[in-house]
Amino acid sequence: MAETVSPLKHFVLAKKAITAIFGQLLEFVTEGSHFVEATYRNPELDRIATEDDLVEIQGYRNKLAVIGEVLSRRHMKVAFFGRTSSGKSSVINAMLWDKVLPSGIGHTTNCFLSVEGTDGDKAYLMTEGSDEKKSVKTVNQLAHALHMDKDLKAGCLVHVFWPKAKCALLRDDLVLVDSPGTDVTTELDIWIDKFCLDADVFVLVANSESTLMNTEKHFFHKVNERLSKPNIFILNNRWDASASEPEYMEDVRRQHMERCLHFLVEELKVVSPLEARNRIFFVSAKEVLNSRMNKAQGMPEGGGALAEGFQARLQEFQNFEQTFEECISQSAVKTKFEQHTIRAKQILDTVKNILDSVNVAAAEKRVYSMEEREDQIDRLDFIRNQMNLLTMDVKKKIKEVTEEVANKVSCAMTDEICRLSVLVDEFCSEFHPTPSVLKVYKSELNKHIEDGMGRNLADRCTSEVNASILQSQQEIIENLKPLLPAGIQNKLHTLIPCKKFDLSYDLNCHKLCSDFQEDIVFRFSLGWSSLVHRFLGSTNAQRVLLGLSEPIFQVPRSLASTPTAPSNPAAPDNAAQEELMITLITGLASLTSRTSMGIIVVGGVIWKTVGWKLISVTLSMYGALYLYERLTWTTRAKERAFKQQFVNYATEKLQMIVKFTSANCSHQVQQEMATTFARLCQQVDVTQKHLEEEIARLSKEIDQLEKIQNNSKLLRNKAVQLERELENFSKQFLHPSSGES
């Protein structure tokens, strides 16, 4: 015949299921705690997860770890109480099918004993407050050990660990607690607090040879005050004694039943009358123990002298065990796991709320960040497009301003060159025709002209140029302002100060007129050289004066040649006439210079022609004029001649650099405006860089927020799955009847 499954397995399965669920729950909350902590401590994600959320979920993680340890140690607990020598230890031994606890004459229990299974093959005991495992081989040795220990008092607990292989009942997480008699102590409250609050079932072992005593009732009244409707069984032990008086058996049984029912229903009010009848049993623990030990040894159950009605008492004991196992398994599952299940659901609800709040905050932040990123991208595109347009406009503006400056400087410099004589006349310094003095004089004159012209040009151009540059810079700044942040706009004038711009004209007169050669030697106005210069000009006069050493009347070959072909009869042109005149005068001058005789001959001819008086008057006037000019050729006159020569020379040289100087000034203006624009562009570049960095930061933040949303949803789905498992656990183990319906 196959053995039926013990109802105690219900608790074992429930414990295994709830332990697994709490293990998953702890793993889930730990994962959620790490997720919330990482989110909270991320400096880039502000206000997504709060410190309160982190503290709360970490607290749940710690609580679940403790609950997991408690669940692993949870077991069904039944406590046996009764008066001294009522047979409590015998009942436990009968249930264990072996003499585990000392019982019988002279072996009363003097302290609390808890019997639980061990996976080892050796029995041992541990006293309260000690971790020492004391080996126990026989029941007598256990009894001897308990009675020899003088430190054991009625309120002490001794753990007896019995091999599970020797006792099937201990394999299903069941702990049986034996107690001293309730009539040996007044410390009932301490007992209850210490040993009864976590008990799932209480068994009152009464002596059927007497009635329920007040000490027994008093104890359970106190238990009922501390616990809400405790599960209480009443065993009327030693019922085999009734076999000696069979005529009174039913009356005695009815009397005990009525008193026990009244105690459970009316006094304690823990069960209904119908349920109470299933909590009261009439047994003989000693008979059952002997019978089961015989059976374990292969002997007949009924061997030995047994009182009449043994089979009925054995069956009732078995009914008690069946009812007890069903009751304790259901009760233990409910008392040990129901509150933890409710607490787990509450934790899941709270964690789900935290995850939902994180998810919502991340979603809102993500939408805001995406909108902000789009705004930043649009602004970056706008700045880039505007910069392209503004760059072309600024280049055009710079070109217009530089051309305007070049024209102004060119006109002003031309006017100043025309007024150069006035500037030279204003120069006063010591003048002397010696080379050393002349060198100093020329150097100072060059400096005077350079300073004067520079000053005059600055007076005429600088203010207008500055106004034009300032206006252009202001226009550029105003056009670029909208592209910069408000904070930079307010500081723009400090970053790009509009300072006064001074043009550098750099005339460099010293080098420009370095090859000037003055001519301040006295020259008579009616002298031969002066006349030649006056009539022929400087270039032709030079040719004539240098040609004195050539042969007399040397004429160009073109005039001496005989034409072989017809020529035009027209008069010679001006160039030919000029060439002929030069040739004749050169020949004449050469003749007069070659011999003084020629002078005498010419003078004689003139003397004969006009007379000596006219010649004398002419020579006198000629000499007087020469003398006048010679006397008036002073240092002052030399200085005037020097200045006039310098003005003519400098005018020619300065006119050559008008275009260069105006171009130089326009280049300076171009550099100034380009530098200003470049500084502004630097600020715009910084702004663009900040925008690019902000866009990159927002993109990273959006990715992180999306990941947070996904993780929070994933964790929430895990929470929902755990809720389903808890619900299934409740239907299967806590409320099986409702689950079936």
Curated annotation (Swiss-Prot):
Residues 1-584, 630-741 are cytoplasmic. GO terms for biological process: cellular response to dexamethasone stimulus; cellular response to glucose stimulus; cellular response to hypoxia; GTP metabolic process; intracellular distribution of mitochondria; male gonad development; mitochondrial fusion; mitochondrion localization. InterPro entries: Dynamin_N, Fzo/mitofusin_HR2, G_DYNAMIN_dom, Mitofusin_fam, P-loop_NTPase. Ubiquitinated by non-degradative ubiquitin by PRKN. Deubiquitination by USP30 inhibits mitochondrial fusion. Ubiquitinated by MARCHF5. When mitochondria are depolarized and dysfunctional, it is ubiquitinated by a SCF (SKP1-CUL1-F-box protein) E3 ubiquitin-protein ligase complex that contains FBXO7 and PRKN. One of its GO terms (molecular function) is GTP binding. It catalyses: GTP + H2O = GDP + phosphate + H(+). It holds the Pfam family Fzo_mitofusin. Residues 178-181 are annotated as: G3 motif. Residues 108-109 are annotated as: G2 motif. Residues 72-321 form the Dynamin-type G domain. Residues 9-73, 338-364, 703-734 are annotated as: Part of a helix bundle domain, formed by helices from N-terminal and C-terminal regions. The chain crosses the membrane at residues 585-605, 609-629. It comes from the Eukaryota. It is a multi-pass membrane protein. GTP binds at S85, S86, G87, K88, S89, S90, N237, R238, W239, D240, S284, K286. Residues 82-89 are annotated as: G1 motif. Keywords: Coiled coil, GTP-binding, Hydrolase, Membrane, Mitochondrion, Mitochondrion outer membrane, Nucleotide-binding, Transmembrane, Transmembrane helix, Ubl conjugation. Mitochondrial outer membrane GTPase that mediates mitochondrial clustering and fusion. Membrane clustering requires GTPase activity. It may involve a major rearrangement of the coiled coil domains. Mitochondria are highly dynamic organelles, and their morphology is determined by the equilibrium between mitochondrial fusion and fission events. Overexpression induces the formation of mitochondrial networks (in vitro). Has low GTPase activity. Belongs to the TRAFAC class dynamin-like GTPase superfamily. Dynamin/Fzo/YdjA family. Mitofusin subfamily. Homodimer, also in the absence of bound GTP. Forms higher oligomers in the presence of a transition state GTP analog. Forms homomultimers and heteromultimers with MFN2. Oligomerization is essential for mitochondrion fusion. Component of a high molecular weight multiprotein complex. Interacts with VAT1. Interacts with THG1L; THG1L probably functions as a guanyl-nucleotide exchange factor/GEF, activating MFN1. A helix bundle is formed by helices from the N-terminal and the C-terminal part of the protein. The GTPase domain cannot be expressed by itself, without the helix bundle. Rearrangement of the helix bundle and/or of the coiled coil domains may bring membranes from adjacent mitochondria into close contact, and thereby play a role in mitochondrial fusion. This is Mitofusin-1. It comes from Rattus norvegicus.
